[in-house]
Amino acid sequence: GSGLVGSEMCIRDRWSVTTTVTSNGSVNGMHDSTMPLSGMVEMLNMQINTWFGGVGVGWLNYYTFIIMAVFISGLMVGRTPEFLGKKVEAREMKIATFVALLHPFVILVFTAISSYVYTHHPDFVESEGGWLNNLGFHGLSEQLYEYTSSAANNGSGFEGLGDNTYFWNWTCGIVLILSRFIPIVGQVAIAGLLAQKKFIPESAGTLKTDTVTFAVMTFAVIFIVAALSFFPVHALSTIAEHLSL
């Protein structure tokens, strides 16, 4: 079937997951040729942008979600939100929320802009080579993947998109800057705020962060805040394409 086009038959699927779940970007098969749901998994790895951390920044995004999970869990069970012996308060939570929501915001806004330009300014698009070699649901997937890869500092792409143009080079550069440097500033600010606070010894009222329950809570926060933010656009692209096969 079409999923075998441009494929390395041995470890292509495993490598497509490995390269997108980290800031790797190398490929041994064409991601654009994978089946729609496989493409969705590849994109979600970068859109969640948490599991294994990124080159040069490590698990900063994961720690952002831990801060959010600690704060929410503390409010739910009536215990003091603490992490590593430091109180997690409103200032840290606000910064963590901003950082967590910036990633989907940047990706979705720029995908909307590119879709608008493609639809309403066809002359400009034609002057840059036409951009899309695939229309419809898959065309939207190609645009979404391009900005997702840029935001996650990945570098892979759905290569049916003609992206070596002024528009794509400039907009992807802007996305990369916004999605990489602003979160780092926010995460370092959280570290600075926590470093200024006094160490609080663990007590009966301390929310334990080394339990299975807290791990499940952290996963739920990641799923709700990160993954579900992209459900509407996937419903219009990868999921819709899958259902149309």
Where are these regions (language model features)?
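Single conserved hydrophobic/aromatic residue that forms the stacking wall/gate
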Residues: 1-6, 11
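Juxtamembrane boundary at the C-terminal end of a transmembrane helix
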Residues: 229-245
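Alpha-helical transmembrane segments and their helix-start/interface "positive-inside/aromatic belt" motifs
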Residues: 88-103, 209-221
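Hydrophobic core segments of alpha-helical transmembrane domains in multi-pass membrane transport
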Residues: 65-74, 100-115, 188-192, 217-229
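Pore domain of cation channels
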Residues: 30-77, 160-195
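Alpha-helical transmembrane segments
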Residues: 75-89, 189-210
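Short amphipathic alpha-helical coupling elements at transmembrane boundaries
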Residues: 16-19, 42, 46, 82-90
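Extended, low-charge hydrophobic alpha-helical regions
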Residues: 108, 112-160, 164, 171-177, ...
